[in-house]
Design a protein with these regions (language model features):
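Hydrophobic/basic alpha-helical segments
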Residues: 3-435
Length: 435
């Protein structure tokens, strides 16, 4: 049923383009990549940005069944036996709690979607879809949703900060009113607000804070945790790199204690699960970080490689990593970003990233203008400062086509995602470990 519902929503263009949860071709990484890219482009113009992260209290447990069914009927066109099926699915559910050998009496569930179900999360996104319409009514604000995580961000300049903050406050007031009407509750204690920009910009804007949001005073945080990724106030990703290093080395210590008990193949599998997954989580957002930060991340992979291969503490790991078929961390970042680019170009998913990419076109006949070569257009930087140029280069609109155009033709023209990943890894492997 979940598959049929998703197909129906897509075929009838009823999918919320700003919601990235529970949708094919979408992920936390694609959502964060879009948000981070938009903010980088704002900073590249010499502006600063404000990002507000909204938190809902027990969001999946407070959905009103009657309101949800009404929304499915009026806004999504479900009727007849289909609507009756959803009514039967949601209503007359009962729940009890068992502690040791004691079972409580049953109570009927009047609110919430079934926990652990496939349909529950999809129904939640449909229930909260009107949030996008409310936020979109404020033209100076941008937003993105991932399940119950709502993010609102906007440009700030010294000339427009007062009006921009007023728009944000009005928007949040409208969001809060809608949530109250729909049995949802914002959690002000976990709502976070951060201003992103240079230290000089933040000093100039300091007089405008704290601001009043939903009756609470908010001063900008120095960092926020955004769907598992740390955004610091300069968007340097240094805080996130530190978090990744701390988490990875914690698991490496545990791994080193049991390595002697494991075969090499099991050790590699466990290392990838415990440490590799943390290195690779949303790692496309690492594009553009400093060489020093990449060295810190590479040290994790090197240490892990030495433990697996029983190498001395200071031994070189280049040959061992080559035998393990491990790309260096910096190349893994490029690999992930290029795979996302390939999917955006060839599947048009997610649409908000696909819209950032344009094929190269030129009136003159050149090698790049040949559509068979699949080159992408790279926007030209028109501002002056070096610091702003860094942000420009870090945006998806610039980083993706720059990396894409550097690939050999046989990689760019791969017929499938599987083929592209294979050819891309071979190409990057040859660059990382030249013969």
């Amino acid at each position: 049923m979940a598959g049929q519902l998703n197909c129906y929503l897509q075929d009838n263009l009823l999918v919320n383009p700003f919601q990235s949860a529970y949708k094919t071709g979408h992920s936390t990484e694609s959502a964060l990549l879009k948000i981070k890219s938009d903010i980088h482009l704002s900073l590249s113009k010499g502006h600063s940005s404000a990002l507000t992260l909204l938190d809902l209290s027990a969001a999946f447990d407070t959905i009103d069944h009657a309101l949800l069914l009404e929304r499915l009927s009026l806004e999504y066109g479900l009727s007849g036996s289909v609507l009756k099926w959803f009514t039967s699915y949601l209503t007359n559910r009962r729940q009890s709690v068992k502690i040791h050998d004691t079972l409580s009496s049953e109570r009927q569930l009047l609110y919430g979607v079934p926990q652990g179900s496939v349909l529950g999360p999809v129904l939640f996104t449909l229930y909260t879809a009107p949030l996008s319409k409310i936020i979109s009514a404020f033209s100076s604000l941008s937003h993105h949703l991932y399940a119950d995580d709502t993010q609102i961000y906007l440009d700030l300049t010294p000339n427009t900060i007062t009006s921009s903050i007023e728009q944000l406050q009005k928007c949040l007031s409208a969001v809060q009113s809608w949530m109250a009407e729909n049995k949802l509750k914002l959690n002000p204690d976990k709502t976070e607000f951060i201003v992103l920009g240079t230290e000089k910009q933040q000093t100039k804007l300091a007089d405008h804070f704290p601001i009043d949001i939903m009756g609470n005073k908010f001063s900008p945080c120095s960092k926020v945790k955004n769907i598992g990724v740390i955004f610091d106030s300069t968007l340097s990703m240094s805080k996130h790199v530190s978090l990744v290093c701390k988490s990875c080395f914690y698991h490496i210590r545990d791994f080193s204690r049991i390595r002697r008990l494991l075969s090499k193949s099991v050790a590699v599998t466990l290392a990838n699960a415990l440490v590799g997954s943390r290195l690779d989580y949303c790692n496309s957002l690492m594009h553009g970080i400093t060489k020093k930060q990449f060295r810190r991340l590479q040290a994790i992979q090197n240490t892990l490689c030495r433990i697996i291969s029983h190498l001395p503490k200071r031994a070189s790991t280049s040959h061992a990593r080559k035998l393990l078929h491990w790309l260096p961390v910096e190349y893994r970042v490029k690999f992930k970003l290029l795979v996302i680019t390939y999917k955006a170009l060839n599947t048009q998913q997610p649409p908000y990233l696909s819209a950032c990419l344009n094929e190269y076109s030129c009136n003159r006949s050149t090698r790049r203008s040949n559509p068979n070569n699949k080159f992408l257009n790279i926007p030209v930087y028109t501002h002056k400062t070096h610091k702003s140029k860094r942000h420009f280069d870090c945006s998806f609109e610039i980083a993706a086509p720059t990396l894409w155009n550097s690939l050999p033709l046989h990689v760019r023209t791969a017929p499938s995602v599987i083929s592209f990943r294979s050819r891309l890894k071979c190409h990057l492997f040859s660059l990382a470990f030249p013969p």
